[in-house]
């Protein structure tokens, strides 16, 4: 038989098999657009604005639908009811971490953010317990954050009211808090190694939100065979991990099991106590990836939120004025802010919540995965299926937040000006995979922002109406545009 004819017949059979398989799977899964072989529904998604693509598809197929990202079926949950029903009401089933190939390759299934099964359960339980032992939610952590807020204010004073890009100054403060928790140390804001570390973190954040990375996560083979920014991501990730591995080696040499100093010490002590088959057993690589997860999550997300908060306060000076008036009334000029103040500052609390709602930092959450077969809203979702939960659709729900595209602290105030909570507020996700550092993040946002506004007036370089608050990138995260401002001592 003609070899060319054999090749054509083989390819035709593979094509038909692919169509049949997708048709069979689609018959069980929630409805969705018809996928093309190999590439799936990728042409129906704008990689520069995935959120809008998901919203458009939800209008056609409802709040629970299936997309094929490449050949892999992915269930998308859109809107508060669907997200809450999955992550809270069926929390155990939806607690798996879906595949994110760029992180799968970097972490090799270890750490706290991208692991699954017993590795994830043991690591998360240990991490939460250790963070509590180190003072999470207690006065000792608050003291650390307050001290770092003081250092941040002093560093901002050194700008002498001149225009500056706040990116790295705002990154130093949360990074130092994480450093103090992980290896009981902090850095001077001008330390070259420290700034290099922050540059790597900032670059990671930007790379993860590029359209190219979204394509790579859909077609993982590109990670191994194509040039691109993903290679820089792996270099930066390895740099941070190796930096932390060196800290781990130093801790191993100076460890006193009777007096654990920090997260690394607690992990080393725990690892020595466990059985050989336990995931925490003397595993430096696992420890390094765990603290790298905490490092990236605790530094870059907070730095980005603080940066975006200042941009919004520049854009809306009437909001800034109200916050500063409340600071003056409750705290005054000479006492440093503390967490007890928050309950007496409803407008400031509302402003911080509105910043997090409006910037929509991780629009589509990190992917989840169902840990067993489940019948969800009369649809069958088989074990191992990746699930995307659109946090953007929750944070921008017009029924809960009128005019959701408008920045308005009133979204979190009642008719009497008192702060009001909302079940729809889930920037940290919700359920079993909710951010482990949520409490610390809330504390940092309040203490850092109130400390800045207590000591400085924010001066933009252009008229507020000309300030662009459109994200520079929207991918895994939302990245604010670059800007400069002046910190004028008040």
Curated annotation (Swiss-Prot):
GO BP annotations listed: arachidonate metabolic process; linoleic acid metabolic process
GO MF terms held by the record: arachidonate epoxygenase activity; heme binding; iron ion binding; linoleic acid epoxygenase activity; oxidoreductase activity, acting on paired donors, with incorporation or reduction of molecular oxygen, reduced flavin or flavoprotein as one donor, and incorporation of one atom of oxygen
UniProt EC number: 1.14.14.1
Family matches, as Pfam families: p450
Signal peptide as annotated in the record: none
UniProt modified residues of type Phosphoserine: 127
Residues bound to heme: 435
Membrane topology category: Peripheral membrane protein
Cellular component terms per the entry's GO annotation: endoplasmic reticulum membrane
Catalytic activity: an organic molecule + reduced [NADPH--hemoprotein reductase] + O2 = an alcohol + oxidized [NADPH--hemoprotein reductase] + H2O + H(+)
Name of the protein described by the UniProt record: Cytochrome P450 2C54
Organism: Mus musculus (Mouse)
């Amino acid at each position: 038989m003609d070899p060319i004819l054999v090749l054509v017949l083989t390819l035709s059979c593979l094509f038909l098999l692919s169509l049949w398989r997708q048709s069979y799977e689609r018959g069980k899964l929630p409805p969705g657009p018809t996928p093309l072989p190999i590439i799936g529904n990728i042409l129906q998604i704008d990689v520069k604005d995935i959120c809008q693509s998901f919203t458009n598809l939800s209008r056609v197929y409802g709040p629970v639908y299936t997309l094929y990202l490449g050949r892999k079926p992915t269930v998308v949950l859109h809107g508060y009811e669907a997200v809450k029903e999955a992550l809270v009401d069926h929390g155990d089933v939806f607690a798996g971490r879906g595949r994110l190939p760029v992180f799968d390759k970097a972490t090799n299934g270890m750490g706290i953010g991208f692991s699954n099964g017993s590795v994830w359960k043991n690591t998360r339980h240990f991490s939460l317990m250790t963070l509590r032992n180190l003072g999470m939610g207690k006065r000792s952590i608050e003291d650390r954050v307050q001290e770092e807020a003081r250092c941040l204010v002093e560093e901002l004073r050194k700008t002498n009211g001149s225009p500056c890009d706040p990116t790295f100054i705002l990154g130093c403060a949360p990074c130092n808090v994480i450093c103090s928790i992980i290896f009981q140390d902090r850095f001077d804001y001008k330390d070259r190694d420290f700034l290099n570390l922050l540059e790597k973190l900032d670059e990671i954040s930007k790379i993860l939100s590029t359209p190219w990375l979204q394509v790579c996560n859909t077609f993982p083979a590109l990670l191994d065979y194509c040039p691109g920014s993903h290679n820089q991501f792996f270099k930066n990730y390895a740099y941070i991990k190796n930096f932390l591995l060196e800290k781990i080696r130093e801790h191993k040499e100076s460890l006193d099991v009777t007096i654990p100093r920090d997260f690394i010490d607690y992990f080393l002590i725990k690892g020595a106590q466990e059985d050989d088959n336990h995931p925490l057993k003397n595993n430096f690589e696992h420890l390094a990836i765990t603290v790298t997860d905490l490092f990236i999550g605790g530094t870059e997300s907070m730095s980005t939120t603080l940066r975006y908060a200042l941009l919004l306060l520049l854009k809306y000076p009437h909001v800034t004025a109200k916050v500063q008036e409340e600071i003056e009334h409750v705290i005054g000029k000479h006492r440093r802010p503390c967490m007890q103040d928050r309950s007496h500052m409803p407008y400031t609390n509302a402003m911080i919540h509105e910043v997090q709602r409006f910037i929509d930092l991780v629009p589509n959450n990190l992917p989840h995965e169902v840990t067993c077969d489940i019948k969800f809203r009369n649809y069958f979702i088989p074990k191992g299926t990746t699930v995307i939960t659109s946090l953007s659709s929750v944070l921008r729900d017009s029924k809960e937040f009128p005019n959701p595209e408008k920045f308005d602290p009133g979204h979190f105030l009642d008719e009497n000006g008192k702060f009001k909570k909302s079940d729809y507020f889930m920037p940290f996700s919700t359920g079993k995979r909710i951010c482990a550092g949520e409490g610390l993040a809330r504390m940092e946002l309040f203490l850092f922002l109130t400390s800045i506004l207590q000591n400085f007036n924010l001066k933009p370089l252009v008229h507020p109406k000309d300030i662009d608050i459109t994200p520079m990138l929207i991918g895994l995260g939302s990245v604010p545009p670059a800007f400069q401002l002046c910190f004028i001592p008040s």
